[in-house]
A protein has these predicted regions:
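NAD(P)+-binding Rossmann beta1-loop-alpha1 motif at the extreme N-terminus of oxidoreductases
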Residues: 1-56
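Alpha-helical scaffold segments in soluble metabolic enzymes
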Residues: 10, 14, 18, 35, ...
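Rossmann-like NAD(P)(H) cofactor-binding subdomain of soluble oxidoreductases
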Residues: 15-17, 40, 47-119
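Conserved beta-strand termini and adjacent loop/short-helix elements that scaffold enzyme active sites
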Residues: 26, 45-47, 104, 142-145
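Short, polar loop motifs at secondary-structure junctions
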Residues: 28-32, 86-88, 123-124
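Internal alpha-helical scaffold of NAD(P)-dependent oxidoreductase catalytic cores
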Residues: 39, 91-100, 116-150
Length: 155
């Protein structure tokens, strides 16, 4: 499974280190994608390249960039794993109508495989997504209606 990260900040770094495998990274011009790619044996590429080459994409950009990034990934039908704060499944579904969507909020210890990942989905995520996220630590399924509260408590 080829994994891509849109956004290469602290949470992308923690997840990428926790997964401990090469991935593709993009950023909005900060240069962090190249730094993260170097640290993980991955590759810094454009968002469009991630859409072409990846089956699973982690959304680690700023929530206000959702529409812009979704346009760059137009038609993507793989798996979207969102770590966007305050962005519910409805907004993600509207942005990615063909994708399988999982909303998550991991904490920083995921970089050591010892974190907690809150997860909400419209239906049961694919087994490979459970397995992938399970590499980061403990998965906690949370109803969408309680997601914001759970992530505030789980920090």
């Amino acid at each position: 499974m080829t994994i891509g990260f849109i956004g290469s900040g602290n949470m992308a770094r923690a997840i990428a280190l926790g997964l401990a495998r090469p991935a593709l990274f993009s950023d909005s011009g900060s240069g962090r994608a190249a730094t993260l790619a170097d640290a993980t044996g991955g590759e810094a590429v454009s968002t469009a390249e991630i859409a072409r080459r990846c089956e699973t994409i982690f959304l680690c950009h700023k929530p206000k960039q959702l529409s812009e990034v979704a346009q760059a990934l137009a038609g993507f039908s793989g798996k979207v794993v969102s770590v966007l704060a305050a962005t519910d499944l409805g907004a993600l579904r509207a942005a990615y109508p063909k994708a399988k969507i999982v909303r998550t909020m991991p904490n920083i210890p995921v970089q050591y495989g010892e974190g907690v990942v809150a997860i909400a989905a419209e239906s049961d995520p694919a087994a490979e997504i459970d397995q992938l996220l399970g590499e980061l630590g403990r998965l906690e399924r949370v109803p969408e209606a309680e997601f914001e509260l759970a992530t505030a408590i789980g920090g």
